[in-house]
Every structure is written in structure tokens, then in C-alpha cells.
Amino acid sequence: MTTPLVEMDGDEMTRILWKMIKDELILPFVDLKSEFYDLGLPYRDKTNDQVTIDSAEAAKKYGVAVKCATITPNAQRMDEYKLHKMWKSPNGTIRSIMDGTVFRAPITIPSIHPCVKNWEKPITIARHAYGDVYKSVEIRADEPGVAKLVFEGKSGKKQEVEIHNFDGAGVIQGMHNTDKSIRSFAHSCFKFAIDTKQDLWFATKDTISKTYDAQFRKIFEEVYESDYKEKFAELGIEYFYTLIDDAVARVIRSKGGFIWACKNYDGDVMSDMLSTAFGSLAMMTSVLVSPDGKYEYEAAHGTVTRHYYRYLKGEDTSTNPMATIFAWSGALRKRGELDGIKELQNFGDQLEAACFDTLNDGIATKDLVNLMEGVEAKAVNSAGFIAAIRERLEKRLG
């Protein structure tokens, strides 16, 4: 390696798996150069969350990061970890600093069949992770009255429309997005489609939302026409826009193998639907891509708290490390790609292939054994699964 990989450690059971993966599957085979940041909750609290900001800035500087799952604290976690403050989601902070879009895709194997029988290839969800209902403000109207939407421009120009004339109690919500954020989202989606050589679908409800959703559609079309149309044609891939309800129907009828770009809420809902329909959230990869081509790889799942508490009691755990392994393989492959190191790219490929070899041989964690068909599967603990992967990786690397 010539350029360091930004390494972000995390919390609970995934932190335990992180060390096992590094010790067994990375360090024996790769001369790893990494810039390390401890995003475990105790250290985030100790640094007043500065470590999260520093790690995101490092990802912007070096271009490729790999991240372990982390805790986003709630009231119970504040008490458990004796925190000074209820710190924000590290993913949200990193996403905001990198101005990135999250792409999630399932890891598919022949013995685990999707619920939708015609899906032959993975479907990647691109979620616009800014604004809309997640940045909304809300009012509870307790009496009759008029709700208005008012915009006061810096020029002094004022726009005002009536939302509703209430004859009784009700609720009111105001939400927003920005052209800058939508444009960044569009660039990230088109670049990722080119990177992975997949068709890109985008869907809103602009027939109903004739200003808000229509602006998303308009910006996507402008960005495509001005910056990406020729490259898409050259690669033989397609940009396709349709309404969100039509998109859902088309996705179910499709064979898969494309990127589905969604607004914030749609992406939140549909990514969970896809992960479940393809088999398991533990088999879902996640990569954050910025408009200027910076990448942060991680597993799509959380810190596996229940298994961690069992681990602390000395009990055996069979926690699925696949998505975390694929975060490492994806990050190392991308680092090799950017630095022109073919051996590193090949290692990423071979590590993933060794994982598939292990599963195809019927060796799996408990969660996967229950899903596998057509193969005599044997459940092993996390250490046993990682050891089996290492054995097959060594064979592949000669």
C-alpha cells in the first residue's frame, strides 16, 4: 500500500469481530497502512465527539475509509456508558462532512434465495440522506385557524401560501431540501452507476408534488444531460426516471442488477424491504460516496448488542461477520484501484471469493443456516467461520 486507509473502529460485538477480521484475514496477507480512529462510544465521549469529525476529515483527505458499526446513544445508553452528552449519530456526522450518498446492496449466494423469485442480481439502494421529513418542523394545531407557508427572501421579497384553514384541531408539517444537496446526490448516483456499470433508476411523485418532487426530477435530468449522458451511452447503461409507485412495481417484476435512487424517506423504507427480501440485514453492504469521489465502506447493520452481552458473559456467539468483511474487501479494492495496485484489488476479490467458498461448503453462522437451501449447512461460531474463510483464502492466494 502507498496511501493509508482510514480505519474507524466501533462498538460492541462488531468491535470484537473487527479485531478478529483484521488479525485473521487482513494483517497476515496485506502490508496494511492505516490511519486509525477509535469511534467507540467511550472515546467519542472522551473527545467530545471530535474524533468523529477528525475521522471524516481524514476520509476526505485520503479518499477511502472503512468503518465498524457504532452506537448512536439514546437515554438508556447515556446511563449505561455514563456519557457527558447524547452524541449524534457518527454516520450522520460523517455523511454531513463528506456530503455523501449511502449505497446499500445485498451480498447474494446461490443457497439463499430472495423472497422475490425472479430477482437474479442484487439491487442497490441509493438513499438521499438529507432533509425532507427528517429535517421537518411540526406544529399541533389545537383550535380552528389558518396555517400558512411563508418564505422571506434576503432581497425582501415575500412568498406566502395558505396551507389549510382548520375548522378544528389538526397537525401541520413543514419540510425542505436544497438544490445543492439534491445536485450532490445526483452526481454521487451517476458516478456510482458508472463505477459499477449498472443502470440507474430514480423515482419521485412529481405528478402530485409539482414543485418539491419536480425539482428533484429536474435537477437529476440537468446533471445527467450535462455531465453523464455520453459516458452512460459509452458503457451501454441507462438512466431511467419513473414515478415511485411505478418504480416499486417494476422493481418487484425485475431481475435486479441496477441502482435505485430514492428520496430520503423512500430510501429509508425500501432499503429495509430489500435487505429482508434478499435474506438478511447481516448480508447487506453499505458504502458512502461523496460527489468528488471519496468512499467510506461499512456494514449496513448495527453493533449486535444482544450477542455482545452474551459474549461478555463468556457465552459462545455465532455472529455473522460477512458485511464487515465485505467492508474491508471493498475498501482495500478501492484503495488499490485508486493507487493502481493490482495486487490489492485482487486481494479484495479473493477475500470475497473465500467467503463464498466457505458458505458454498455449508459452513455458516446460525442466522444463515436457517436461510440456506440445497446445501447441508453446519452452524459454527464467529471465530470458526472466520477461521474457515482464512483456510480458503490461503488456498486461493497460494
Each model region followed by its residue ranges:
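Glycine-rich phosphate/diphosphate-binding loop of Rossmann-like nucleotide-binding domains
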Residues: 1-20, 149-242
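Internal helix-turn-beta structural module
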Residues: 314-319, 337-398
